[in-house]
Amino acid sequence: MSDTTILQNSTHVIKPKKSVALSGVPAGNTALCTVGKSGNDLHYRGYDILDLAKHCEFEEVAHLLIHGKLPTRDELAAYKTKLKALRGLPANVRTVLEALPAASHPMDVMRTGVSALGCTLPEKEGHTVSGARDIADKLLASLSSILLYWYHYSHNGERIQPETDDDSIGGHFLHLLHGEKPSQSWEKAMHISLVLYAEHEFNASTFTSRVIAGTGSDMYSAIIGAIGALRGPKHGGANEVSLEIQQRYETPDEAEADIRKRVENKEVVIGFGHPVYTIADPRHQVIKRVAKQLSQEGGSLKMYNIADRLETVMWESKKMFPNLDWFSAVSYNMMGVPTEMFTPLFVIARVTGWAAHIIEQRQDNKIIRPSANYVGPEDRPFVALDKRQ
């Protein structure tokens, strides 16, 4: 195998990263997404992420991924109406959520809630495309309800009504979290961040969902597997760690001095670099503008200025660029989102991409079963039980 990979329909050469297993190895075909073909680009079904983030609401992108096309104005209105009607939780799902302790990891709550929903509203035999899309829409509409019903009950003993009349998924999330409708600015910020997180080709959680789908398993099982993969700190959770880093410091100068020492000591700084992008993460420029606007509106540029300074430091010292997580941490923090909910928000966005990949994998209708390079001992003589030492 060559030590470089030339992506199809592109002259851009990507060198596989030694720290990432199977880096640069194509593991299947997809018509859903391209990542880093030119080193710093991202497309969903052929549409540039910069155009989608600038012009689309999240529900438009969800429709693009799950239902295969950007909706017309009438189709978007009908889709939003459908999603609003799907925000409620069955009684037994609420009962399951009420049994989970407050100390539960929110990602475990998401996984358990989806499993309970799958037991209550299981996928029908036959696994039709229309049925899978309906389940995807139900999950998209109700994941915020699952998370925040548990959160308020476990922390305050309050049984909230998870149905709201908010126009968007992001608005619904913020309304349930804070108990009031969010500002237009916050709702717009959520639209953008969810669009940016919605899809990213064969990342670990998406590939997990495709492996499960390839076995002929149900939609819920594939989504649950993806949530489990995203729970791992090497995949999801980078924005949570990014905020922890930023909150260590009181000033940009203090942050710069400490990070330069850590870089000299070969410490890894989470929030920088990417397994696929080689030039820059195209999502970064978008979320950075969002973070700055939210910080200005909130009357505090402290976290933004620290994050901005460290962006400069990491480029000067390591030639490492920030990824989406670095300034999404600032954005979510400015909207009052608890740090432990950053990765669940990732789930709410990415369920659209996961669902699209599951549907696509089913159409391929092949089980995924790669081979392994055996590195163990060969031709060992068998030793009888009584003679082993």
From Swiss-Prot:
Induction: By propionate, but not acetate or glucose. Expression of prpBCDE operon is regulated by PrpR, CRP and a variety of sugars such as arabinose, galactose, glucose mannose and xylose. Keywords: Transferase, Tricarboxylic acid cycle. The active site is at H235, H274, D325. The keyword DNA damage does not apply. One of its GO terms (cellular component) is cytoplasm. One of its GO terms (biological process) is propionate metabolic process, methylcitrate cycle. It catalyses: propanoyl-CoA + oxaloacetate + H2O = (2S,3S)-2-methylcitrate + CoA + H(+); oxaloacetate + acetyl-CoA + H2O = citrate + CoA + H(+). Transmembrane segments: none annotated. Optimum pH is 9. CoA binds at V268, V269, I270, G271, F272. Substrate binds at K82, H200, R283, R350, R369. Pathway: Organic acid metabolism; propanoate degradation; Carbohydrate metabolism; tricarboxylic acid cycle; isocitrate from oxaloacetate: step 1/2. GO terms for molecular function: 2-methylcitrate synthase activity; citrate (Si)-synthase activity; protein homodimerization activity. Belongs to the citrate synthase family. Homodimer. This is 2-methylcitrate synthase. It comes from Escherichia coli (strain K12). The gene is prpC.
